[in-house]
Amino acid sequence: MLPDRTGTAARAGVRLAWSEFGSTHGRADQPAIVLLPTWQIVDSRFWKLQIGPLARHFRVITYDGRGSGSSDRPSGPAAYSNAECAADIIAVLDATGTDRAVLVGLSCAVTWSVIAAADHPDRIAAILAISPSCGFPVAQPRDKHAFDGPYAGHQGWATYNKTFWLQKDFRAFQEFFFGEMNSEPHSSRQLEDFLDWSADCDPALLVDATEGRLGLGGAACSDIELRCRQVRCPVTVVHGTDDRVRPLSVGERLAELTGGTMVVVPGGGHALPARQPVLINRLIRDVMHAALPVSAAGAVADRPPAGGRRSSRAGRPPKILFLSSPIGLGHAQRDVAIATALRGRRPDVQIDWLAQHPVSAVLRSHHERIHPASGALLSESRHIETECGEHDLDAFEAIRRMDEILLNNFSIFAELIESEQFDLVIGDEAWEVDHFLHENPDLKRFRFAWLTDFVGWLPMPDASDRERELTADYNAEMLEHRSKFQAVRDRSVFVGNPGDVVPDLFGPGLPSINSWVQENFAFSGYVTGAPVPGITDPASLRACWGCEDGDLLCVVTVGGSGVGGALLRRVLDAVPAMINRVPNLRFLVVTGPRIDPAALPPTHRVSMVGYLPDLHRYLAASDVAIVQGGLTTCMELVAAGKPFVSVPLRRHFEQNIHVRRRLAQYGAAGSLRYEEAAVPDLLAEAVGTALTRPPVYRSVETDGAERAAGLIAELV
């Protein structure tokens, strides 16, 4: 997320780089939220999962602490004393024009917030202390290893040592320390982030910063217990029971000394903002609301309780919130069909959609109701497009790296279901909602139906050992979620049949995907976007794009995202070769809603169009098609009995494994590699062969939408 304002605060010759978000929020009498830096081993990027959700409602300030990020790096331990770092907080408040602030600190930053609040009670409205690392005389196993003592080994906390950092293996310490910070299972993404944020950390500077914090090397260190007793503002302490950096007893002592409120996170580690972002963001919001003037706080007084079911709807029509995955258009097409069938069964239901582009384009063409909250969603399609190379998308890694967007969009959802009452939520591959509801089951106060057409993150056949470990770990987390919190989903619907599910294992030592899905899902059969028999005049459709009697029409489409541009260009390059092989061939290139047709070169016998809301009609009116490899487009062609050439995205595990399995069930096995499709003569040969070999597909069921609606209607 980009800041609204940036600048520097200068104090004692040290410049501190700050950023401000949500600048339009808050009145002059309202405090800002300041997300404090922490130990100089990382910069302020570790707040990435807090900034977006909080900045929608509050003014939020972050800054790189001295010695990190874009701020200056003074030398010597005295420059990094707790008093210096605490004084930096006030300097940033002054530079940003902030009279009062709620301070949110992680680890050693809690000490700085305590000193700032004790010295400037008029400036600090409240403190949220996360995993505090204060210098209390509390027994800790790590204390047997002295930071400035002799180097004692390569393992564990023995690596928290000045000599080890400067003369041995600083990287080994980073890997150990961030592993301890992120001690919860399934924290691979968080560990990667912290290692990345620490990549440019200078061990000599970190020695200075650590000695300054500990009062070594001539740095002054005040009595922190005395400073805690001097704090007058409200203090909330949150600490995990599995914190391996500082034990829970440190947080309990801080709460005792400040008269603060203690929040214990069962199983929580040290890096709670990264591993428990929904909980931390809710706590920050609650602390902020308590610090607001009465007139401002009144706006949130009617918020519902944090857990439990709401009261009955008292005679009003049942309300449904529908979420449809925005990665492509296939989900939207089938979800509209399901919604239509659901209304046929329950005409009284009111359906709102929480949706973003390109799903919103489909919904508008069907006159569906898009909830205004949709405008705050961050674009998942744009992220996927930035992750894509030339017809190359590591779909698993792209989803992993979308964590900031997914958390933001879940926050939109959470605020919506907190402010409005919905009886049922339907999530079609709404990954963020399913994941974070399992992480925060107390937020569920509605019935939840989960839809998907594939189950299981799978490594590509040529995957590295690391990818195999990660996919298995993500699958294991999902299985644990489902085992522990079965009540989160009231109905799991697989959009397909049992034979469509891959036979692979979730990972080494994990169950068979096919067996597990059959035990945990209901099956709707495939859901077509619209019944093919609705096409009454294919000749008219063909004529719209220049087809004359005797012409053959090849429809070229790459789905609803913008990742198909490379394939479209390769197809256009091959048009002369294809016409040479099939002289009466014409082309309709459908670029979709996220690729501008004008960006492609005009080509003889080729018509181009962007988004076609009734694409299925043109697919059924075609003679052959060239497609990217997404499930919906391929299955619509199978349902229409049309030959096609599919070119799956490289490294896209769903298209290359799950979709291929599905198509094989209908007798549509086989595809063209992109390297082959990029050779005009090979693509022309594939199209010519497809035209001369009429396909023999297994018939596709047409009642999938009705079956899915029937399964869902039971929840209303």
Give names to the regions the model predicted.
Residues 14-73, 78:
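Conserved HGGG/HGGXW glycine-rich cap/lid loop of the alpha/beta-hydrolase fold
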Residues 230-231, 237-239:
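Short beta-strand/loop motif that positions the catalytic acidic residue
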Residues 118, 125-164, 646:
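Flexible "cap/lid" loop of the alpha/beta hydrolase fold
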Residues 139, 163-220:
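Conserved alpha/beta-hydrolase catalytic His-Asp/Glu region
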Residues 318, 345, 349-400:
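Conserved nucleotide-sugar phosphate-binding/catalytic loop shared by glycosyltransferases and other
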Residues 48, 52, 62-108, 282:
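Active-site loop/oxyanion-hole signature of alpha/beta-hydrolase fold enzymes
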Residues 458-562, 592-594:
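A nucleotide-sugar donor-handling region in carbohydrate enzymes
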Residues 507, 525-624, 676:
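Donor-nucleotide binding loops and adjacent catalytic segments primarily
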